Amino acid sequence: MDELSETQVMQNETATAVLPLLNGESQSFNLQKHLKYLTKMLDPLPSPFTVLDASRAWMVYWELSSLAILGKLDSSVCERAISSVRQLKGPSGGFCGGNGQDEHLLSTYASILSICLCDSTDAYSLIERDRLYDWLFSLKNPDGSFRVNNEGESDARSVYAAVCVSSLVGISMDDPLFEGTLQWLCKCQTYEGGLSGVPYAEAHGGYTFCALAAIALLGGLDNLNEIKLSTWLVQRQDPALYGFSGRSNKLVDGCYSWWVGASHVIVASGYGSASHKSLPNLFYNPEKLLGYILQCCQSTSGGLRDKPPKRPDQYHTCYCLLGLSSIAYDYRYHTSDGWSYKPSILHSSLSSLLPAHPIYCVPFGFEERIKSYFLSQESSKF
């Protein structure tokens, strides 16, 4: 008998942990336990969390996003968040990962989404748009991509971050800032159909979302092979465990319910294509995905996780909740009216969740209010 590969061993171990839960007593969405977990994460964190010092901006966003998608984000939490994000402001217009650190494009993305969620003039005023614009230009590469900082890497995450935050603060997608960016992103589509972090690398669920969302904002979805992309996205749902994986021959992970799930929504909605033609339904089984998240990703003490037997964390709580929102509603995009959504057939199981914008990763409405604010502000740059 042939020896099993490491991949096969890990898949068997995952199935052994997942299947008893998947086939066990039916679980409902446990709102109160998740709120208890999120409330606890607002307390001072113990010393092991010091390893996440450079992820402060992200921890603020994950907390705010989770509370917001549950409709439980209040002004007192926003005031604390504004104070925290203010300490992360850098000298050039970007935001840092932690206090006193260098500005970083991904930390800037997380900080601006947090500002968006705080939904107030006090929060919006933390963004110095003209300085941010100059800083983004300083990170631009000749090939159209963006570095995360002056000496950092360039990939689909950093490009999406640049495009996304620019869109939120009123920088046009036709601005010279994005010359060559769409072309660079489209080179990231692989022979499998998904998109990679950089051209000619392996397709990945997280990078696919980042590249696809940026391409959609730039209006270039027609440049992709959508049939191959859709096929690859369908293949991300495990046929036995029903969760999504991030790559071929990789394990299911609750966070991909958003990275892959939102990618399905973008493609099906028609947003970012010339025709804006929407499809009648998604290409995967949302009911089975719901089962995986509710049965296997909910911790008994609250919060959500990658997969059993792992512990819950802020990252997976945030993106599992966003993933659940993506199946709680049917999303469409209309040229004249913009985005619309209505409860899906699964909504009754997830009625405490608000609809999430598949591009901006915040509940609908927040993105429009920050855009309106910056459209009313004068700029010397554009």
Swiss-Prot record:
Highest taxon above the source species: Eukaryota
CC terms in the record's Gene Ontology section: cytosol; nucleus; protein farnesyltransferase complex
Site (Important for selectivity against geranylgeranyl diphosphate): W58
GO molecular function: protein farnesyltransferase activity; zinc ion binding
Cofactor annotation comment: Binds 1 zinc ion per subunit.
GO annotation terms (biological process): protein localization to plasma membrane
Needed cofactors: Zn(2+)
EC number: 2.5.1.58
Residues in PFTB repeats: 78-119, 129-170, 178-219, 226-268, 286-328
Keywords per UniProt: Metal-binding, Prenyltransferase, Repeat, Transferase, Zinc
Pfam families linked to this entry: Prenyltrans
Group of enzyme by EC: transferase
SUPFAM superfamilies: Terpenoid cyclases/Protein prenyltransferases
Keyword Transferase in record: yes
Keyword Iron-sulfur: no
InterPro entries listed in its UniProt record: FTB, PGGT1B-like, Prenyltrans, Terpenoid_cyclase/PrenylTrfase
Residues involved in Zn(2+) binding: D253, C255, H316
Residues holding (2E,6E)-farnesyl diphosphate: H204, G205, G206, Y207, R247, S248, N249, K250, Y256, S257, W258, W259
Reactions catalysed, as given in the entry: L-cysteinyl-[protein] + (2E,6E)-farnesyl diphosphate = S-(2E,6E)-farnesyl-L-cysteinyl-[protein] + diphosphate
Subunit structure: Heterodimer of an alpha(cwp1) and a beta(cpp1) subunit.
Similarity annotation: Belongs to the protein prenyltransferase subunit beta family.
Entry function: Catalyzes the transfer of a farnesyl moiety from farnesyl diphosphate to a cysteine at the fourth position from the C-terminus of several proteins. The beta(cpp1) subunit is responsible for peptide-binding.
Protein name as annotated: Protein farnesyltransferase subunit beta
Organism: Schizosaccharomyces pombe (strain 972 / ATCC 24843)
Originating gene: cpp1
